[in-house]
Amino acid sequence: MGDRGARPGRLMPMLALLSWAAGLGVAEETPGRIPADKLLVITVATKENDGFHRFMNSAKYFNYTVKVLGQGQEWRGGDGMNSIGGGQKVRLLKEAMEHYASQEDLVILFTECFDVVFAGGPEEVLKKFQKTNHKIVFAADGLLWPDKRLADKYPVVHIGKRYLNSGGFIGYAPYISRLVQQWNLQDNDDDQLFYTKVYIDPLKREAFNITLDHKCKIFQALNGATDEVVLKFENGKSRVKNTFYETLPVAINGNGPTKILLNYFGNYVPNSWTQENGCALCDVDTIDLSTVDVPPKVTLGVFIEQPTPFLPRFLNLLLTLDYPKEALQLFIHNKEVYHEKDIKVFVDKAKHDISSIKIVGPEENLSQAEARNMGMDFCRQDEKCDYYFSVDADVVLTNPRTLKFLIEQNRKIIAPLVTRHGKLWSNFWGALSPDGYYARSEDYVDIVQGNRVGIWNVPYMANVYLIQGKTLRSEMNERNYFVRDKLDPDMALCRNARDMGVFMYISNRHEFGRLISTANYNTSHLNNDFWQIFENPVDWKEKYINRDYSKIFTENIVEQPCPDVFWFPIFSERACDELVEEMEHYGKWSGGKHHDSRISGGYENVPTDDIHMKQIGLENVWLHFIREFIAPVTLKVFAGYYTKGFALLNFVVKYSPERQRSLRPHHDASTFTINIALNNVGEDFQGGGCKFLRYNCSIESPRKGWSFMHPGRLTHLHEGLPVKNGTRYIAVSFIDP
């Protein structure tokens, strides 16, 4: 009895609804194509974040008319990412539709905005909508939520997606108005469930003439469909293509956990970057610092979290930044006692130009996360701090204009692209794996290698980045941004920024510098950088190879003071000094004795007072140096000879009147020999040099950092000329013995 009694109560409003729908002749009264100005986009945004601005920019690109509801209001619709909710959107739409309910020729497109971009224009949307021959079309989804128990109530779909997605729908204004008039719930109730229950009710579905966009012709929900969609470049345009249905959806929705994929698509759509024209948004909303009277104040955060090679050069490069020093303040965290001397030298130099310098040393015993929180807060708490520029010690900023370039891009968070030399290792990730770690995006290699140049919205960046001070005092006003669960500090920062809806960008519009490797950095030597030829070859070359080395091949500066004795620059002053220091620090000079356990047979016929490279662990480095820098010179001066770049004897010789002042005539046990002067005649010693007896030719003024190269056995009998006072050092290798 109860059931039979309930039927009339349910049927009466449904009959009224059907009668109302029959009275509307929207489809018949709108012959031909609907004009673009008859489409109104409605969205809800109680705040304006980066996602909202991206949505509005894409709408502006296609000349959509957009009405934003809820601006300035408190959001009471729940946490849509982690729970049901969203009812506030329905209420706001219900209120707004009272104004449009009678406009039978008006089409309403309701969509999310924080995680949506348009890929096509109003004409395309309306054309596709009209072809459905329905009054309301909802986005379709392959996933059923929030109530999986309703699956059986959905109409069967043979091709396409079966379930409703409330993130986007389009329909004639009277039908949309009547649909949302059904809402009588609370703001924190679920909008998805509300629309679902309307759709799965056969009578209501018929009354409202609702269908789903089963093949994603208009709406593309990315959640559950990431393997269906690809980026498509064609005819100067960038589109998202659904490869399952061969469609080009117009509104792309990064619902659920797919916001990172949407950010990737948003780097290209709508025509943000194309193969023909490159980056279309790079110069939009930028700042021209040349027109600014007072330069923005920048807090430069420097972080030395592990023993780092080439640190003095890193610090000195910070002082070469093309930015007014009076607008800089420094925050330095140094975790390593090993680097305290480098910091002191740097601060003594920097304090003359930079008035505010805060140093947090190893005695504070701060974790990396605590130190980074402190550095960021140093800017956050200073109302005059316009930007926070964080730089790790493993970043080599070779472009002095880096800071200016980043400021002028005018993004909340932006990082310059830096990579390891010759590798794909960089300071950003283009995608994330399901567990939140590195995954390679389709465009990662092209961005790293500079095949695609622009400003890229990415899920992770580290090592060096710029954050606007006003962002730290608004969206990111919490102090503890570098601690989250068990994540590394850099991952915690990026996770927090993503959750706050703050976009992070990477720029590869310029060459900014590179990353160095801190792996395998052994600090047991006196001058540890000398061992970095394998890990950081570019930095090693810059520090230790003579600046004129390249002129050997471009300007033919090789000299020939004696027949087949070639003379050329090879080492920098620093290389010479550090090699001598390293040998003296080791201190176990051989004394120039004939009996020598270091060599095969234990006897040296022409002994020198020396230390072998092998004794200080430098042998492999030295042999690599020979192959990389000596071998090319060999090919130039000894045409047709290809060296193996191998030497059994590599050593530094020490000449002094007190120990060994000269060396008697001899042939070297080599195909050819190199002899590099490590200090200056006239300054460090008097006398010395080398005489080639067969040619009666002497070289008495060796140049520091320059090498002799001459044949070894048979032709070039030679002797070491006496040192009169001081100490002379040379580095020698018997190559291809």
From Swiss-Prot:
Cofactor: Fe(2+); L-ascorbate
Pfam family, one: GT_PLOD
Catalyzed reaction equations: L-lysyl-[collagen] + 2-oxoglutarate + O2 = (5R)-5-hydroxy-L-lysyl-[collagen] + succinate + CO2
Membrane topology field: Peripheral membrane protein
Catalytic residues in the record: R728
GO cellular component: rough endoplasmic reticulum membrane
Main location: endoplasmic reticulum
Domain of life of the native organism: Eukaryota
Localisation: Rough endoplasmic reticulum membrane
Glycosylation sites: N63, N209, N365, N522, N696, N725
InterPro entries: Collagen_mod_GT25, IPNS-like_FE2OG_OXY, Nucleotide-diphossugar_trans, Oxoglu/Fe-dep_dioxygenase_dom, Pro_4_hyd_alph, Procol_lys_dOase
Extent of the signal sequence: 1-25
Gene Ontology MF term list: iron ion binding; L-ascorbic acid binding; procollagen-lysine 5-dioxygenase activity
Positions of modified residues (Phosphothreonine): T320
Function, as annotated: Forms hydroxylysine residues in -Xaa-Lys-Gly- sequences in collagens. These hydroxylysines serve as sites of attachment for carbohydrate units and are essential for the stability of the intermolecular collagen cross-links.
Subunit structure comment from the entry: Homodimer.
Protein name according to UniProt: Procollagen-lysine,2-oxoglutarate 5-dioxygenase 2
Species: Mus musculus (Mouse)
